[in-house]
Amino acid sequence: GVDKAGCRYMFGGCSVNDDCCPRLGCHSLFSYCAWDLTFSD
């Protein structure tokens, strides 16, 4: 994910990883942001 205004938090709707906030990635099956298993950028 990326640190930008309007980024989606956990379980926020998304279409690509960059829709999500840092350390979150877009879950391909459910189309929401989920933790990408990282602890740092």
From Swiss-Prot:
Q: Which GO terms describe its molecular function?
A: calcium channel regulator activity; ion channel inhibitor activity; sodium channel regulator activity; toxin activity
Please give the name of this protein.
Answer: Omega-theraphotoxin-Hg1a
Q: In which tissues is it expressed?
A: Expressed by the venom gland.
Q: Give the UniProt subcellular location, in the record's own words.
A: Secreted
Q: Which family does it belong to?
A: Belongs to the neurotoxin 10 (Hwtx-1) family. 56 (SNX-482) subfamily.
Under SUPFAM superfamilies, the record lists: omega toxin-like
Instruction: Tell me what organism the protein belongs to.
Output: Hysterocrates gigas (Cameroon red baboon tarantula)
Protein role: Toxin that blocks vertebrate P/Q-type (Cav2.1/CACNA1A) and R-type (Cav2.3/CACNA1E) voltage-gated calcium channels. Also inhibits sodium channels (Nav) in bovine chromaffin cells by delaying sodium channel inactivation.
The record comments on the domains as follows: The presence of a 'disulfide through disulfide knot' structurally defines this protein as a knottin.
GO CC, sorted alphabetically, is:
extracellular region
Q: Which Pfam families match?
A: Toxin_12 (PF07740)
What keyword terms does UniProt attach to this protein?
Answer: Calcium channel impairing toxin, Disulfide bond, Ion channel impairing toxin, Knottin, Neurotoxin, Secreted, Toxin, Voltage-gated calcium channel impairing toxin, Voltage-gated sodium channel impairing toxin
